[in-house]
Structures are given as structure tokens and as C-alpha cells.
């Protein structure tokens, strides 16, 4: 079973909320990565694991002909409204429904870690990229520099994953993305880090935003709403800044590779 069967129902429960809250928090990563791929005017572009399509919309604004794939049809409905000319399809990142060499630029933001087999997912990104094209992967950075990982860790303690399940931020470990790209036959060019603070005006806003994400929905399904809300409130209160803001500072990173 591919990732779509598992992830699609989880991520599709609050698509409008996701698109206006946490997806917007990720936008610094999207914009930095798109900038690193070079000019997009007149190019074909795919975002695999596109969610509600913010990165695709940003690519379209730079002149690209955009496509997107995601496990969640409700999220794709938002993406289609944002970019009516785009080609957005539901499916598995491990089995992309596009022909070999279809795109000049292929990205995947915080998507590879949800694949049943990340190596297969990255091989698919490489397959649909044309020779001479670019593949870029964006992920959470060093967990020790991501305050939101403290929240993730507490939530995982409520509903531990089955034995043998890959660590959710395993692809964030040093060199992992680069190795996946290299094994897919791509030439790694480099990358960079991007500051991605996640800030909310109050705890209610934080709760609404965080529970639009698939992993939070899975934990709620397992243990119920009250324990999850208690964890979110406790962690965010502990991270409250001296100015009173509910802000978690994070570092994300991207890696860019070329297809020979």
C-alpha cells in the first residue's frame, strides 16, 4: 500500500485551515527553494506532495506551467482554485502518474518523509524530471534546531509509531537527502538552510492550525482530543517568548540536484 491510502484521509480533514495557516508558515522554504532552482519562466514544474498548492502557485507566478500531486483530494481542490491552469492529481509519491522526463523542475516539500519508501519516492522524482532538469527537496532541518520538534516528540509519546517505523525526521539527518538524490542518479549541487518561525497569536489559533496537519489527526484518532490539546498548550506555553508571543523557531533546509 502506498502513502496516499494512509496520508490522504488524514491530511484532507481541514484543507482550508491548512492552506491559510501552517502551509503559509512554510512559505519561506518554498520561496527560497524556487529561487535556487533558477528562472522558471516557460518551464514545466511539478510539486510532489503539493498540499493545497502554495508552492505551485508561487511557481506559476514566476511563469512556470505547473502540476501537482498529493494524497489528499480536498487539499488538491484548494490548489486548483489557487492555480486554475495547473494540472493537479491525486496519487502516490512512490508512483507518480506522469511520463518519464515530463518536467524541467521537480520539488517535494516535507513530503518524502511520509513516503512508505523514501528511496522509491526520490527515484520517482528523478524519473519524471527531464535530462538537464532540476530536482529539489525541502525538509525540516536539524531537529535540535527546530523547536517544533519538541512538540512532535511529545505527541509521538502519546501514540508511539509501530516498531520499525522510520523516524519522521529521519530524512533531516545530515547527508540523508543528499544520499537519496545521489542514489537516484542525480548530481547534488548543494542547498541551504531557511529560518521558518511558527508563530501564533494565542493558543486557540495554535490548536486550530496544528490540528489541520495529518500527523496530529492520527494522534487524535488514537488518544482523543483532550490529551493532544494539553500537550500543545503545555509545549507552546513553555516556548513562550519574553515578548509574550507563541513562537517556535525552526530551521528548514533544501537540497538541489541536477539530472544528467
Where are these regions (language model features)?
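Conserved catalytic/acceptor-binding region of the Class I
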Residues: 119-120, 130, 134-201, 217-218
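A short, aliphatic-rich alpha-helical micro-motif
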Residues: 39-40, 100, 122
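A short acidic, Gly/Pro-enriched loop at the edge of an enzyme's catalytic core
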Residues: 94-105
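Conserved class I S-adenosyl-L-methionine
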Residues: 1-41, 54-58, 75-78, 82
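A short SAM/SAH-binding and catalytic strip from SAM-dependent methyltransferases
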Residues: 105-118, 141
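Conserved Class I S-adenosyl-L-methionine
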Residues: 7, 23-26, 52-54, 169-260
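Class I SAM-dependent methyltransferase SAM/SAH-binding core
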Residues: 44-95
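A structural alpha-helix within SAM-dependent methyltransferase catalytic domains
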Residues: 34, 57-60, 119-126
Amino acid at each position: 500500500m502506498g502513502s496516499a491510502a494512509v496520508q490522504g484521509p488524514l491530511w484532507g480533514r481541514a484543507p482550508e485551515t491548512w492552506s491559510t495557516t501552517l502551509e503559509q508558515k512554510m512559505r519561506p522554504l518554498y520561496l527560497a527553494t524556487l529561487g535556487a532552482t533558477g528562472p522558471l519562466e516557460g518551464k514545466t514544474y511539478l510539486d510532489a506532495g503539493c498540499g493545497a498548492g502554495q508552492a505551485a502557485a508561487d511557481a506559476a507566478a514566476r511563469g512556470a506551467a505547473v502540476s501537482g500531486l498529493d494524497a489528499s483530494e480536498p487539499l488538491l481542490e484548494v490548489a486548483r482554485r489557487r492555480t486554475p491552469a495547473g494540472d493537479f492529481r491525486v496519487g502516490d509519491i512512490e508512483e507518480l502518474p506522469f511520463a518519464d522526463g515530463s518536467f524541467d523542475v521537480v520539488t517535494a516539500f516535507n513530503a518524502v518523509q511520509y513516503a512508505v519508501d523514501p528511496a522509491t519516492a526520490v527515484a520517482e522524482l528523478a524519473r519524471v524530471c527531464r535530462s538537464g532538469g532540476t530536482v529539489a527537496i525541502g525538509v525540516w532541518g536539524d531537529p535540535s534546531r527546530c523547536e517544533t520538534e519538541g512538540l512532535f516528540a511529545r505527541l509521538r509519546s502519546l501514540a508511539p509509531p509501530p516498531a520499525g517505523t522510520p523516524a519522521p525526521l529521519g530524512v533531516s539527518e545530515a547527508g540523508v537527502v543528499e544520499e537519496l538524490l545521489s542514489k537516484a542518479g542525480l548530481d547534488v549541487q548543494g542547498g541551504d538552510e531557511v529560518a521558518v518561525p511558527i508563530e501564533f497569536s494565542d493558543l486557540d489559533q495554535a490548536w486550530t492550525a496544528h490540528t489541520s496537519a495529518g500527523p496530529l489527526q492520527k494522534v487524535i484518532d488514537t488518544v482523543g482530543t483532550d490529551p493532544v490539546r494539553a500537550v500543545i498548550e503545555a509545549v507552546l506555553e513553555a516556548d513562550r517568548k519574553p515578548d509574550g508571543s507563541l513562537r517556535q523557531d525552526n530551521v528548514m533546509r533544501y537540497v538541489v540536484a541536477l539530472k544528467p
